[in-house]
Amino acid sequence: MDCRLHLVLFFSCVCLICLSGQQETGFVYNGFHQEDLFIDGIAMILPGGLLQLTNASQLKIGHAFFKQPFGFDPSSSLSFYTHFVCALVPPKFGAEVGHGMAFVVSPSMNFSHAFPTQYLGVFNSSTNVTSSSHLLAIELDTVETVDFHDLEKAHVGIDVNNPISIESALPSYFSDALGKNISINLVSGEPVQVWIDYDGSLLNVTLAPIEIQKPNRPLISRDINLSEIFQDKMYIGFSGSNGRLTSNQYILGWSFSKSKEFMQSLDLSKLPQAPIPRNEQAPVPREEKKKLHPLLIGLVILLVIPVLMVLGGVYWYRRKKYAEVKESWEKEYGPHRYSYKSLYKATNGFVKDALVGKGGFGKVYKGTLPGGRHIAVKRLSHDAEQGMKQFVAEVVTMGNIQHRNLVPLLGYCRRKGELLLVSEYMSNGSLDQYLFYNQNPSPSWLQRISILKDIASALNYLHSGANPAVLHRDIKASNVMLDSEYNGRLGDFGMAKFQDPQGNLSATAAVGTIGYMAPELIRTGTSKETDVYAFGIFLLEVTCGRRPFEPELPVQKKYLVKWVCECWKQASLLETRDPKLGREFLSEEVEMVLKLGLLCTNDVPESRPDMGQVMQYLSQKQPLPDFSADSPGIGGFMPVSVEPSSTIGIPDSSMHVTHSILEGYGR
């Protein structure tokens, strides 16, 4: 009896070892079951075993991974082989689709950091591009992303640690019979076979329609050392994502093995079928032809022709009235693009009564959208198309930057020779109205210090919180808006600049306002330090209640920075405060703000604080550093003697747009 029991235990152990070894080596699925995979996002397994990564939902992600990791020994030659069948089905017949899917090898199944759209549910805008990401993705991308150097429209690519492909090709397969490549439509909804083979040094990607055997020649072949990328344990699976354009993405079957010898074949006859695209063109029923009297036909024609002419004239007039400029590359920005018709109606036809300000190259109008939302619409003239694509992309990106002390930029509209920028309307206008115009009540010191803290917080977010960092480049009182509760909101993204982590800049405009420009600006270009300089001028502007340059004043008072510095030397710093403050202020706080303004306007950029430090000083969580009016760089710069509202241009590759989107409400 004991001998029989030992035999049973022995064979049971052998079977378990064999099963474990088979799972470690590979698997094959001719259809899927819920217990086989780890699934998240909108991915799901449909009845019949069809794995659906995405549906027609916008901006969504779906993942499906084999639950157990596979062991890879980076110290020795590693290999793997996979074969799967997928289908990317448009939501309806002939529709454009987005955004694509990828086969993924990753050290983790946690992709909570990943973005949809062009990031395919695997990467995000700040994905580390070093080898520490340990990610391999073979993408079937259906949308061209210019920033990623994508090929046109649908393409296949190899991604290592970031979404920019190291190798890519248009989808096709090699026909031995014809001796040439035959194109494949990835987004037709028809099943496509994909083979990915890695033999230790060469990564091959091969495609073919469902009815074609594996071609002898791969679509992509790339020498790569994956032992530098893979860790000891790696997960394998699929990721799919949608943008504003969507598609239903399916996996019908999947085979994987670390060894070519043990690779199991898919049984294509057993695979579930993917749904076909909907054809919403209903058939027109045939009706029996009826004979009409010739006189009746003639009468109908005489009546119909004038009506058609009138309708045609009305249609032509309305089309010309609401005509816009639209190009194919703008489709992805759809939610950020407003129709001219909607803006025309919101502003009652851009009537004079809706005009709330002028500045730069355009006028600002107040409008109300159908839902009751109040907007500000700035109409800018533009003739050249050069740089327009980059400018619109940056406007849309800046529209995604959210902070309680930034004026929300909602979107844009393009017409021939005209660009319209749409932002949220600020009911209390711009701060300069209250500082420099006697018809408006002057803000108290408590209101002023609160506004200064608001704008410091906004600028600190642009410099340190936004990704990539943004340089504002035109901080001044006329670009600070006040909402319904008199909170400070920083506007004027018309001149903002992005700064990438390497310090490279891409400009939406290349101008600045005299009196607010740091002395090094023309020599070295814009930087966070030049923004801090302008903020220092803004501190003095708000505290003293005057502009940085007043040509009608005596010489000793003409330049704000120099005047404040001289008064500090004469122990009369508080005399520079705005007389309209009266006695309702804290002397120590006013002196601190004035000194901080001088510190921010130091001639030496490296001696200026960053905006994080400025916030600490304003909230008095940290004392000002020890310096005096005689310290090097304090109060020494003399700006050019021109009108303070003048702007100058600095050479730049991008189109030029000046002044605030919201500048000058109520003037």
Swiss-Prot record:
Cytoplasmic face of the membrane: 316-667
Extracellular side: 22-294
PROSITE patterns, per database record: PROTEIN_KINASE_ATP (PS00107), PROTEIN_KINASE_DOM (PS50011), PROTEIN_KINASE_ST (PS00108)
Major enzyme class: transferase
Domain Protein kinase: 350-625
Annotated segments matching region Legume-lectin like: 24-257
EC number of the protein: 2.7.11.1
GO CC, one annotated term: plasma membrane
Binding site for ATP: 356-364, 378
Signal peptide: 1-21
Mode of membrane association: Single-pass type I membrane protein
Keywords of this entry: ATP-binding, Cell membrane, Glycoprotein, Kinase, Lectin, Membrane, Nucleotide-binding, Receptor, Serine/threonine-protein kinase, Signal, Transferase, Transmembrane, Transmembrane helix
Similarity comment text for this entry: In the C-terminal section; belongs to the protein kinase superfamily. Ser/Thr protein kinase family.
Protein name according to UniProt: Putative L-type lectin-domain containing receptor kinase I.4
Origin species: Arabidopsis thaliana (Mouse-ear cress)
Gene name of the record: LECRK14
